[in-house]
């Protein structure tokens, strides 16, 4: 492999190995940027050489009819032993949504809430990375990431209802204004050393810092009562570094292994209007992976052992420091027969730890108007085990995969909601109160005939949930997706997407059936490309049913997502 291709390989490895550093929304431009890199590396042969400036990249500009703008740029500089890559993306959007929430209680009373939500969103991401190879087998890398989000939400609500005896409840009016800024900074330092006979040694230090101030002003009044103004300010500070060392062996007679040690710290502080919450974690994760490959057989397994310390200080007399020692396992076996058939069987055991939001013990205004949230510091991790089998057929015109998975989750962290009659708000918290299991079938395929291609997918799931806040009856979910595409003369490409979701059932709520339809057209003009999207043509209402011990809540959302998106890209 030439030196140039080696640099490209390192760039691709960066996108994979440092996803936590460069975690950004997947958008059209990132797919364009990937095609830029693919143009230089085809079948291990250099198909196109950059010009004498050693500079190449691209830019994308898009805008939608409902008030969204999405400019992005990507540039790479390559010369001798130096590779410099930078990416910048900006997203401005505005969305108006109407929502009706109906709550029926077992006591016989009911509440109706009508809300209009206006959301303004500004997002900016920047990342740059420098790779330097002083000599063969040694690569030094440094990188920085900066991300800034600003979200402003204005909600206006009218609340009505009836008491259990049929009397009309006094109407309540509420206006809520929420503003939060989210600044994330990251830094990466990495060194890779290749040994001729042993393999590759990778060391990495990743630093992340998050600053997120949130301001919420909620003004509530009744038709014949005084107004009540509630003001809340919350600021989050989070420093989250980790250090990693990994040894990857070369392949000997089909065998290879890797050993990794990763140490992570998280130091978080949340200052609210009247409270302070400190959330500190320490983790030591050891991973051992082994793999064997043969002409018709491939085996691999990864064993992980983690010592995890969760230290919570809510400035109360109770002690909330917890120590966990957990093991996780992933195994997979793949059998191939012929050039077209492949069968894979996998077993996975994993841990899901509660988030800081679920642990935060103080009552605060939630992300939705009329909802209060309080965490639970007694939450424990949930454990899951999954067994999955899949079959893949790959032909010249048709590729399809069928999979069947069974998953069992214990000590599930489930959401529980209740209604506070005094504040006229729903109060949401979390409990380790449930076990659930599901059986999931998926079929996915791609059909190719000349200029026509179509990708399709079907998913079905049977869920059995056993929690104190919801019934344990079996519940089915299913969905179907199709994406036909055709290439026309003069470099035109047309595609459409159809998505049908049946009654989509989750652990304690379900969504009604819906049909979504979008259309896309692309025109290629040498280094330019023109894009046009018609998004969410049908724009269906979204209905959700949530069941708890003492109430059933129905939410009807009327989004304003139908729009025309136009854009262009340029690569050099």
Region roles according to the model:
Residues 54-57, 98, 124-126, 258-265, ...:
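Surface-exposed extracellular loop regions of Gram-negative outer-membrane beta-barrel proteins
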Residues 458-465, 475-524, 538:
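C-terminal beta-barrel architecture of Gram-negative outer-membrane proteins
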Residues 101-109, 157-167, 218-227, 273-278, ...:
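Flexible, surface-exposed loop regions and adjacent strand-edge segments
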Residues 17-160, 174-212, 237-239, 245-259, ...:
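Membrane-proximal, glycine/serine-rich, low-complexity loop/turn segments characteristic
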Residues 230-236, 240-242, 376, 380, ...:
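Outer membrane beta-barrel strand-and-loop segments of large Gram-negative receptors
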Residues 8-16:
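Bacterial N-terminal signal peptides
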Residues 59-60, 111-116, 169-177, 225-233, ...:
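Extracellular loop and loop/strand-boundary signature of outer-membrane beta-barrel proteins
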């Amino acid at each position: 492999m030439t030196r140039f291709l080696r640099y490209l390989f390192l760039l691709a490895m960066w996108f994979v190995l440092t996803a936590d550093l460069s975690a950004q929304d997947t958008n059209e431009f990132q797919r364009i940027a990937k095609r830029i890199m693919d143009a230089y590396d085809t079948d291990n042969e250099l198909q196109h050489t950059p010009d004498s400036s050693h500079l190449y990249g691209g830019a994308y500009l898009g805008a939608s009819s409902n008030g969204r703008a999405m400019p992005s740029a990507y540039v790479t500089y390559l010369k001798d032993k130096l590779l410099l890559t930078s990416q910048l993306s900006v997203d401005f959007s505005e969305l108006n949504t109407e929502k009706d929430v109906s709550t029926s209680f077992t006591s016989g009373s009911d509440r109706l809430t009508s809300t209009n939500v206006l959301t303004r969103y500004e997002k900016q991401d920047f990342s740059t990375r420098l790779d330097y190879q002083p000599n063969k087998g040694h690569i030094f890398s440094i990188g920085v990431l900066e991300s800034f989000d600003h979200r402003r939400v204005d909600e206006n609500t009218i609340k009505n209802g009836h008491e259990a005896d049929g009397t009309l409840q006094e109407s309540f009016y509420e206006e809520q204004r929420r503003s939060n800024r989210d600044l994330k900074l990251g830094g990466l330092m990495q060194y890779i050393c290749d040994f001729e006979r042993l393999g590759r040694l990778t060391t990495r230090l990743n630093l992340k810092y998050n600053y997120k101030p949130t301001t919420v002003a909620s003004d509530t009044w009744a038709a014949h009562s005084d107004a009540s103004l509630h003001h809340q300010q919350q600021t989050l500070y989070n420093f989250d570094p980790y250090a990693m060392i990994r040894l990857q062996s070369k392949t000997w007679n089909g065998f290879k292994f890797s050993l990794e040690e990763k140490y992570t710290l998280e130091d978080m502080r949340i200052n609210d209007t009247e409270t302070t919450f400190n959330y500190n974690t320490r983790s030591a994760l050891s991973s051992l992976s082994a793999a064997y490959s043969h002409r018709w057989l491939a085996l691999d397994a990864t064993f992980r052992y983690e010592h995890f310390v969760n230290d919570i200080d809510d400035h109360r007399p109770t002690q909330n420091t917890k120590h966990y020692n957990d093991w996780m396992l992933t195994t997979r076996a793949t059998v191939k027969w012929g050039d077209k058939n492949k069968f894979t069987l996998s077993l996975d055991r994993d841990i899901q730890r509660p988030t800081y939001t679920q642990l935060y013990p103080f009552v605060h205004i939630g992300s939705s108007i009329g909802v209060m949230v309080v965490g639970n510091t007694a939450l424990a991790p949930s454990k899951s085990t999954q067994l999955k089998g899949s079959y893949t057929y790959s032909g010249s015109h048709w590729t399809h995969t069928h999979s069947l998975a069974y998953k069992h989750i214990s000590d599930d962290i489930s959401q529980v909601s209740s209604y506070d009659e005094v504040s006229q708000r729903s109060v949401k918290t979390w409990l380790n109160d449930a076990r659930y299991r599901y059986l999931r079938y998926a079929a996915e395929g791609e059909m190719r005939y000349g200029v026509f291609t179509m990708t399709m997918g079907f998913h079905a799931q049977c869920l059995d949930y056993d929690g104190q806040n919801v019934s344990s009856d079996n519940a089915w979910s299913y969905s179907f997706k199709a994406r036909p595409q055709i290439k026309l003369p003069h470099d035109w490409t047309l595609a459409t997407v159809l998505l049908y979701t049946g009654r989509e059932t989750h652990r304690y709520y379900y969504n009604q059936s819906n049909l979504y339809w979008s259309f896309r057209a692309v025109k290629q003009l040498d280094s330019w490309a023109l894009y046009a999207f018609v998004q969410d043509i049908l724009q269906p209402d979204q209905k959700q049913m949530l069941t708890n011990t003492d109430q059933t809540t129905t939410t009807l959302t009327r989004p304003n997502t139908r729009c025309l998106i136009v854009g262009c890209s340029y690569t050099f």
